[in-house]
């Protein structure tokens, strides 16, 4: 756990009042407007084995062409690709050389296609290591009626190719193509804002944190026992000072200020509905203003719930920051649910923004259907925001003129 979590802010400067939907936190958030255009590259590869190439190299005449199978990518449906190999050279002037070309063809003979691509040729040895390589960039322009355009190498010295022939007399060619589809059709998307809670108080000195936790561990001068855990499960006792509990929780203050309360008479507080881990985190925070225990996302939710129950707002905000720092596609729906349940505005807004930006991945989760059935109001609100964001993310792309 980082020092930011271990040696956090002194919650004694922050009022621990009950939270509700109408309450607004005392923290400040840093807001900024940011967008991103991501024209992703498409990479195609073709591996082609030409058997008995040693004989082909000796006996092929100029103009004799071998062709690979046609390959394509569904993201570029208008174009397909093929390798063309001339063991004896493409023309008479290319004799004693090998010619290799990459051909792009339009999938529709009546359609004009223009693509700029980087293409790489490799001849691979028996260990699949490149013995020959070449990199070029070309603009492929296929237009009717021919419908195809080639770029490549006319004069690869025969000696270089011979050095690449494998022990089984074959030649293995690997071709890598990288291209970007029409970038003008790539929408610009708003970058989700994941705000950071800036605690409105000073940093706690490390020595103070350590001395407070040492006092808790020693049990010196304690006058109260907290028993945590269900009656039929794992339980743990914590020896604490009553004044610490009263100072940082309105609920404990009310409980321990009345002599007729059972907890005050028995000097014992039973917490049956939370695990010892969650109670330990709460007690550590009451003493030192930090959560020393290493807690995961699910435990942070439990600690946030116990902070809500005992009205320790600073602890609740610390858990909120813990969840913000670990927000991802797999837990965003669960975090939205908890943020709504415990009235954590910053976490809720960040989760919604994150879910909108990653809506395709979020809606593909197996938990998405459960979220719709279990939280229909939340799901409806989120879907509405997703639709509005999609409508406003980018102006409509103009259709090209025919």
From Swiss-Prot:
GO terms for biological process: proteasome-mediated ubiquitin-dependent protein catabolic process; protein ubiquitination; regulation of proteolysis. Residues 1-25 are annotated as: Disordered. The keyword Nucleus does not apply. It comes from Caenorhabditis elegans. The gene is bath-40. Residues 43-177 form the MATH domain. This is BTB and MATH domain-containing protein 40. Probable substrate-specific adapter of an E3 ubiquitin-protein ligase complex which mediates the ubiquitination and subsequent proteasomal degradation of target proteins. One of its GO terms (molecular function) is ubiquitin protein ligase binding. Pathway: Protein modification; protein ubiquitination. Residues 222-295 form the BTB domain. PANTHER family: SPECKLE-TYPE POZ PROTEIN. Pfam families: BTB, MATH_2. Coiled coil: none annotated. The lineage of its organism: Eukaryota, Metazoa, Ecdysozoa, Nematoda, Chromadorea. Keywords: Ubl conjugation pathway. Residues 15-25 have a biased composition (Low complexity). SMART domains: BTB.
């Amino acid at each position: 756990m980082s020092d930011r979590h271990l040696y956090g802010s002194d919650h004694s400067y922050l009022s621990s009042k009950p939270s509700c939907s109408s309450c607004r936190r005392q923290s400040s958030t840093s807001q900024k407007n940011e967008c991103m255009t991501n024209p992703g590259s498409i990479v195609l590869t073709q591996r082609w084995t030409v058997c008995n190439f040693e004989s082909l190299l000796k006996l092929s005449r100029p103009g004799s062409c071998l062709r690979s199978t046609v390959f394509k990518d569904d993201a570029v449906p208008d174009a397909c690709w093929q390798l063309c190999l001339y063991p004896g050279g493409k023309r008479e002037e290319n004799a004693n050389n090998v010619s290799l070309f990459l051909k792009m063809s339009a999938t529709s003979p009546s359609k004009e296609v223009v693509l700029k691509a980087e293409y790489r040729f490799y001849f691979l040895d028996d260990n699949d290591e490149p013995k020959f390589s070449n990199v070029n960039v070309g603009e492929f322009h296929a237009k009717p009626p021919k419908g195809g355009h080639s770029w490549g190498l006319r004069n690869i010295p025969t000696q270089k190719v011979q050095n690449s022939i494998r022990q089984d007399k074959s030649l293995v060619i690997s071709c890598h193509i990288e291209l970007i589809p029409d970038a003008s059709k790539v929408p610009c998307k708003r970058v989700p804002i994941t705000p950071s809670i800036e605690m409105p108080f000073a940093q706690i000195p490390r020595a103070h944190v350590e001395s407070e936790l040492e006092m808790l561990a020693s049990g010196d001068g304690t006058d109260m026992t907290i028993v945590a855990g269900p009656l039929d499960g794992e339980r743990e006792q914590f020896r604490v000072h009553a004044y610490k509990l009263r100072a940082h929780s309105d609920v404990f203050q009310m409980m321990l200020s009345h002599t007729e309360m059972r907890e005050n008479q028995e000097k014992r507080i039973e917490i049956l509905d939370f695990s010892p881990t969650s109670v330990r985190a709460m007690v550590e925070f009451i003493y030192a203003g930090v959560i020393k225990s290493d807690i995961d996302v699910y435990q942070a939710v439990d600690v946030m719930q116990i902070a809500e129950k005992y009205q320790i707002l600073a602890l609740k905000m610390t858990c909120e920051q813990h969840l913000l720092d670990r927000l991802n596609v797999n837990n965003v729906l669960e975090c939205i649910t908890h943020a709504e349940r415990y009235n954590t505005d910053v976490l809720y807004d960040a989760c919604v923004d994150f879910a909108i930006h990653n809506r395709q991945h979020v809606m593909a989760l197996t938990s998405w259907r459960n979220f719709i059935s279990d939280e229909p109001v939340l799901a409806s609100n989120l879907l509405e925001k997703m639709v509005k964001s999609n409508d406003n993310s980018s102006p409509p792309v103009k259709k090209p003129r025919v």
